[in-house]
Structure formats: C-alpha cells, structure tokens
C-alpha cells in the first residue's frame, strides 16, 4: 500500500500489475489524483468497485461485504470439481496421524502446487477459515503424497461449496476504533516433526477483521505454555505493525492494542514475575512482550478456550466449533446478485 499526501489531504493506493485500487480523504484530492494519472496513462475509472483481483465487493448502507464467490466458481471450472456435501475443509479426527501414502509423480506434484496456490490466495484474502488447511498443506509443497492431494481436494471442494462465506465490515462508525487480537497455539500438533502451530487474528473493532495468520513455529516448544508464549510474541509483533500502519494511513490513532490469550501461564510469564529458569531459552521473546506491556502499548488479557476466535487457525476442529469460530472472527455468509450459486451444500461431514 502506498500513501500520497497533498496538503492536508491524502490518497491510499494499492497496485497489482495494472489494477489500481485507491481512496482519497476528499473528493477533490481523488479527482486531482485521477487527473495526474491520466496525463500519462489510459485509465478505465470506476467510482463503484464491485470486483478486485477476483474478489467480490458489495457495498450496502452501513456495511461492506467481501467474498471470493466468483474466484471459487473459476476454481471449480478449472479443476472440474464436482458437488459434494462437506462442512469443514478437512477430515476431522481425534489425532493428527502422520500420512502414509504413495508419493505423487512429477505431474501430480505440479498439479498439487497449482491447486495449493489457488487455495492460498483465498486463505490470505478473505477466507481465514481456510488458513489452517492452506498452511498445513503447504508443508508438503515439494514432496506431496496421495493423502495430501486428497486433503487439498477436500479443502478446494469446501471453498467451492461455501462461496458466500466472506468478511463483513461496518462503516460510518462513530465510536473510536480499537485494535483487538486473539492468539492461540497448538502444542506439538505436527505429526511429522512435532512442531507447534501459531494462530492469530486481529479485528479493528467495531469495523471488522483485518489480519490473520496460521503458521508453524520455528522452535520446538517443550510445553503448551511455551508454545503459547511463542505465539504470543508473534501476535505482538503483528499488532505493533498494524498499529503503526493504521496511524500512518490516518485510519486510526491508537495508543495501545489488546491481545487475548487462553493460556494463563503464558500471561503470567509476560508479567514482571513470570520469568524462570525453564523459560531462559525464550528470554528474548519474554523481554520483548514484557517491554511492550510495560510501555502501555500492549494490553494482555485472558480469554477462555470456548471463546477463542483463533482456535480454528491452529488445529482441526469439529463442525460445530469450526462454525462457531467463523462467527467469532467476523466472517459471514455474503450474498448478492453477482454471487454464483453454490455447487453443493454444507452438510454434517
């Protein structure tokens, strides 16, 4: 994102190849900016944006809806995906057993990589509910097996069969925005190397979700508390970045941000008297989070696991908990006249 200032006015600009998306603080600066561009470029200007990079954008009074319905329809045609009835992007089992199946041949590997790229795009743009699956499947990008391809196909079927799930944002807000994050970790959940997984999501309240991530931790966590604290450090860094970005873009002036964690031991470690011999090897992370709390830029609070919005970013969940997390994070079923009909239905699988 770029920011251009002209006096007291400014333009926020996003560029992808030859597609520009911009907004001005006033109509005058927007008109001036378009005039400057048209001096050197031939532009097709649309004052009402309904699509951008395959995403549907629907604006109504007080709300903006974002989904990947058109993109999902394209994926269905590209990979000839047939209708199915599923409610999650993965097969839920009590444990994450290591896959044991035949490795794919070179042609299969290339197909796996193409499909995964499509899934990743949806996951990072407007489908946080796909983030865990996309991140986990990316682990096998170079040497996927038949079991991984089956899981990838299921995730794509889920995307195609739930095209109206997207993000909802509220505009014309009169209250002061607040940056609120939720962070979670799954200890030693990877069946291949027992690495833990970090998941976090940030919402600009009461507007909507603005950032999320599901990623494997670089360190081997020796306990669930340690895994949660490593995740807490990653989420704190993202919160600081978002706070500065919002201020620079003049979208919000925030003195601090809030972060909710469901591990009370990790919260105690972040406080003044939480450091101990068993946490010496994560000392830098400890002092980083502790310093942000003492400076008043981070407000760390407890959230029960039952209300942890980031839970579906770290592990496989059953149908009911998975759908509840979708609601907690601010995702919604978004429908419009331009939304292709679902190729199937969500069921109990």
Segments (PLM) and residue ranges:
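Mobile genetic element proteins and their domesticated derivatives, centered on retroelements
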Residues: 1, 18-20, 33, 37, ...
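Active-site palm subdomain of RNA-directed nucleic acid polymerases
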Residues: 1-17, 21, 29-31, 40-49, ...
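Catalytic palm subdomain of template-directed nucleic-acid polymerases
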Residues: 4-41, 56-67, 139-146, 265-278
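RNase H-like nuclease fold core
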Residues: 119, 181-225
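RNase H-like nuclease module associated with reverse transcription
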Residues: 140, 178, 218-349
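Structured nucleic-acid-interacting core domains from mobile-element enzymes and related host factors
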Residues: 157-185, 253
